[in-house]
Each structure stands twice: as C-alpha cells, then as structure tokens.
Amino acid sequence: METIWKFEIKPKDGVIEIMMPIGAEILSTGAIDDSVFVWAKFSTDDDTESEPRYFEVFGTGHNIPVDMGIDRKFIGTAFMHDGSLVWHIFERI
C-alpha cells in the first residue's frame, strides 16, 4: 500500500532539512494560505524509517549559487498572496 503526505517547507535563506520516509517520491509542491508544501508518496508496507532530505527555496529574481559543487533538482513553483510571492523549490541531490 502507498500513501501521500504533505511536508511543510518554510522559505528561508539556506538549506531546509525535512525528515521523510526512506524512498519517498516527491510528487509536487504548492502553497496553502501562508505555507509552502511538498507532497510525497511512499510505501506503507514496511516499517519505513525516516531520512533527512534537503531543500532550498528561491524567490523569483533571487540569486541561485551555482559554484558550490551542489546538485539540485527542481521540484516545482509555489504561488502565495495571489502570485505576489513566487517560490521555486529545489531538492539537493
């Protein structure tokens, strides 16, 4: 059996650590009210342990460092306050 959970990501400078079940597949991102979330699917067949996952959030027009030896995977874009705040979520891989 599988399930989907949402995990809150609080936009801030730097890396955001979120504990997720091992092997969780990130499905999408979005905003609800004043919060940004990612949704992830994972198996509930085992007693799945958690692992840290690392995310970064950048606003439109903000600088994204590229010379740090870090690989990032784009997860999605979240719109807040009727689109006046736009966040782009990346996972460090």
Specify the residue positions occupied by each region the protein language model found.
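Catalytic phosphate/metal-binding cores of nucleic-acid and nucleotide-processing enzymes, i.e., regions
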Residues: M1-I93
